[in-house]
Curated annotation (Swiss-Prot):
Keyword annotations of the record: Cytoplasm, Lipid biosynthesis, Lipid metabolism, NAD, NADP, Nucleotide-binding, Oxidoreductase, Phospholipid biosynthesis, Phospholipid metabolism
Gene name, Swiss-Prot/TrEMBL: gpsA
Family: Belongs to the NAD-dependent glycerol-3-phosphate dehydrogenase family.
Catalytic residues of the enzyme: K192
Pathway: Membrane lipid metabolism; glycerophospholipid metabolism
Record's protein name: Glycerol-3-phosphate dehydrogenase [NAD(P)+]
């Protein structure tokens, strides 16, 4: 039995906390919202994010950062990308011993263009860092928490961290493969959110299966181009952390990125869509980061460029689709 602290009480962190508890581990969740903490401790639910799920009664929650830090030597970092550096820094300020960090965030930091593992590495002093890994792949929290068969990938620069992650999470409904390409797995999880928003737009406009298939295929191509430029193995993008995550995020209404895109395709403004969703949509921030990163690295990413124009320059979605279709003739 292993003690694990889960930082973050969103949908995926909650679903994975439930997996860990059902696997026999001691789980403490940390969150800032005292009402959510009290609800989990009293009712064993987290209705804001997983409305109908009844959680393992052995999961406990706290808003006390010191208690959360002292509880375990393994931390599951289930926070939005934009909050990761701040919380990791707060953790570091209170550490007195080495900890292992496993994150499930799917984004790239605005401004620095850093992957999440790099953000954590920046924030945690080397003397307290026992290793950093990621768990990623096609895994909607709504399905994981009700034990629908799900398969994901664990990756780290340290193979022992990948193996630890596999051992902690794997059971009869959650299968975990290890993968040595940390860069590729992290980029696959982050970049697919851009394509998922675009896929939602295509669906919201009412375009057919031909357009959806083309978008995912060409989206995977530009993900691979940037990934290879940044040091990833292109083959990673044909695995769970790449095309697997891309497919599930581009076709499902469980996906908040797809849902945002769908609302935009239906004619809603971004502010209106986000106010209705009341959730963090990583694809917005990732699009901003990757748009500038691709320009810096001189990588052609036409779908990302088009989505950036929709999200940040108020260009109409139909105009951007027209521009994509009328690009210069090229070989595939």
């Amino acid at each position: 039995m292993t003690k694990i602290t889960v930082f973050g009480m969103g949908s995926f962190g909650t679903a994975l906390a439930n997996v860990l508890a059902e696997n026999g581990h001691d789980v403490l969740m940390w969150g800032k919202n005292q009402d959510a903490v009290d609800e989990l401790n009293t009712c064993h639910t987290n209705k804001k994010y997983l409305k109908y799920a009844k959680l393992d009664v052995n999961i406990i929650a706290t808003s006390d950062m010191t208690k959360a830090i002292q509880f375990a030597d393994i931390y599951l970092m289930a926070l939005p990308t934009k909050a990761m550096r701040e919380v990791a820094t707060q953790i570091n300020d209170k550490l007195t011993s080495k900890k292992t960090f496993i994150h499930v965030a799917k984004g790239i930091e605005n401004g620095t263009f850093k992957r999440v593992s790099e953000m954590i590495e920046d924030s945690i002093s080397p003397e307290y860092n026992a290793g950093i890994g990621v768990l990623s792949g096609p895994s909607h929290a709504e399905e994981v928490v009700v034990k629908q068969p799900t398969t994901v990938a664990a990756s780290s620069k340290d193979k022992s961290v990948s193996k630890l992650t596999q051992d902690l999470f794997m059971n009869d409904y959650l299968r975990v493969y290890t993968n040595d390409d940390l860069i590729g797995v992290e980029l696959g999880g982050a970049l697919k959110n851009i394509i998922a928003v675009a896929s939602g737009i295509v669906a919201g406009i009412g375009y057919g299966d031909n357009a959806k298939a083309a978008l995912m295929t060409r989206g995977l191509a530009e993900i691979s181009r940037l990934g290879e430029k940044l040091g990833a193995d292109p083959m990673t993008f044909l695995g769970l952390g790449g095309i697997g995550d891309l497919i599930v995020t581009c076709i499902s209404t469980h996906s908040r990125n797809f849902t945002l895109g769908y609302k935009l395709g239906q004619g809603e403004s971004m502010d209106q869509a986000l106010s209705e969703m009341n959730m963090v949509v990583e694809g917005i921030y990732t699009t901003k980061s990757v748009y500038h990163l691709a320009k810096e690295k001189n990588v052609d990413m036409p779908i990302t460029n088009a989505l950036y124009r929709v999200l940040f320059e108020n260009i109409s979605v139909k105009e951007c689709v027209k521009d994509l279709m009328e690009r210069d003739k090229k070989s595939e």
